Amino acid sequence: MRKSVVVALLVAMVATSCRVLLVPDPPGPRSHDGFLPSWYWEARQSSYLDYASTQFSAGSPTNLIANAEHSRRTGAPFNTAGITMADYANSFSRMDNFVDTADFDLTYIMNLWYGYRDLLPADVRAGIESHMRSFKYWFTDPQPTGTIDQRYYWSENHRLLFHADEYLAGQAFPNDVFSSDGNTGAWHKARAHDFIDRWLTEKTKYGFTEWHSDVYYQKTFDALLTVVEWVDDPALAQRASMLLDLLLFDMALNVQKGNFGATHGRSYMKDKSKATDEDVFNLNKLLFDDTSLPYDNTGDPGASLMARAQKYHVPAVILRVAQSKHTTVDQEHMGVALDAGAPVDHTQTGIDGYSFTDPQNVEFWWERGAQTAWQTVPLTLDTLDSTGLWESDFYKPFKAIADITGGDRVAAQNLAQALEPMLGFALLTAVDTYTYRSDSVMLSTAQAYRPGKFGEQAHISQATLDENAIVFVTHPKNEPQSGTQWPDDDGYWTGSGSLPRAAQHGALSMSLYAPVFASPGPPLTAFRYLDYTHAYFPQERFDEVTQSGSWTFGRKGDGYVALYSWRPTHWRTYTDPAIFTHGLTQPFDLVADGGADNVWLTQVGDAQKFGNFAAFRAAVLANPVNVAPRPVAGGLPGGFDTSYTSPTEGTVAFGTTGSLMVKGVETPLNTGKRFDNPWAVANVGAQQITIADTAGNLKLDFANVTRTASATRRHHRHGPKDGRPGGGNR
């Protein structure tokens, strides 16, 4: 009788949720209350603290945090005398001179001060406190005469970092008058409270603007954890914990052997060519323990802050997601749909209540890189006029728009719309991401994201087999650059001169390149692109690489990848020692000459599905790729119609325009879901999100600001008992 009732309940659950809960594989540490048990989590924290404390870097606040926490836990000596004002002279100078990213410095120094100020020498402590009261916390605050503010306040991560910094400074010194603007600390705390509230509300509704970023998720993580650990408002701290859960869930869904190798809203070649270059690597290792590679930064911000965290507790289900060996698909929708290429329509006044003209919404639109969208150009110009930001390095180029149009806002809107494929280079609009992952390989794509347009930092698609074996394609803006590292502005591998129209279904991704603008001359040479596309396919990081016709195949362990190019390819030879190659000595740059338009296909597989590598290659080659170029239109490539019968997906057809067809059935690129995967299905803007498997769940109720986790009584890997009661609300 009991068995039949249980079966009936399970059937009802499946019918209601339209999904079957996964049995965790591996099972993970036994959880009694839905959160990671303290014995396990403290061991993970210690794994980083033990490593970080092998070095003492007095000028690194995050390394000092790790050393101080290690000392607190183990009784090891802490070298207070080794810290001097000279160690912080550069950070203080950056703050005093309005240098960009000084908010990063202040966040880490603020965490050091809040957690371990009693260990700091009196003069260093006083210097920190003085800068907490003198820092300029927002772009609308007074700027000293004769100085230029070079800070960027408006990206997703910067916004919350500035607001958290301001809140904590005001919280620490509520009655003091801040020299930056003459307001009290209490005033600053109240303003920051409202800013943080707005930011949290936006993320709850829209998800993360800088989607899956292997660079900036670390900064957003740092800001959220800072709010959780130190802000004295319980509701703000709880909401930040809940968004931190979603950020880590996002990372867990898109990590493969320590590599956050998904499509990225913002990334750089210096961060994405291998896992240990990613800003999130040490944090991922601490959290998920899914790579054998060692920690590699004794002052890593994310890992240092997480290794000393006391108030934030990691839900056990998130670890199980990251470590899952199941073959799964995750589809996500994030961001705000702003079409800056649509015809100018002055009856459009805003989106979802966010006005295009209200000065209170500057940070909302600028976070999304919409400074040059025709909808917000008047607001941008008005803001630059009123704040004096024209002189900053970032906004100087925008002066050309104002000069060309003589300050006429309508003319500026028309110009912005006409040049949108170029001027929208930094736009972060709504995105639909698709990630296929097995135990041996992962493939991830941003579906049909701004096709044909210039992309400054967007990373559209990638196959990831392990920490180092990855494959991706870009349309280069410039030839390879010399130097001792990949430059931030390396347009050869970072971003794309034009973004492809890409679509993924299962283990197959198609990327169709067809620029919608001609490579320009002066004064728009910053938007030039080269007449070819290419792939990053580092041969020495694979166990095998072989080619057959238009296909290039790679194997790493039991993971397989096949890359197709419609245009003929060749391996670029690097003979100039001045060109940075990150130590690669074997070919890694697969170039497809002949035009900026091309069709690239990526098919992945593994030994579990295909058996050996030869069988995978034979299956991929069994059917031809059919590519039909469309006629040239207006001197620009017309694009393509492409079809291929995949060994895993059947016949898939996709074009430069039109629907994705799978086995003759139209397949939407947008599911309308914030999350759609085996652990969570939630609509965009959902106020309740449940992340679950058969071992337990996490329930987030943003409407009521509750965060509850639970564990089912199953057979898990055992460790010492936690002593915590079952069920948790933290």
Language-model segments: residues:
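Hydrophobic helical h-region of N-terminal Sec-dependent signal peptides
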Residues: 6-15
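Ser/Thr/Asn(+Pro)-rich, low-complexity disordered segments
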Residues: 13, 25-161, 174, 183-196, ...
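Charged/polar, low-hydrophobicity segments characteristic of intrinsically disordered regions
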Residues: 99-111, 139-154, 198-213, 246-274
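Extended amphipathic alpha-helical segments with heptad-repeat/coiled-coil character used for oligomerization
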Residues: 225, 234-313
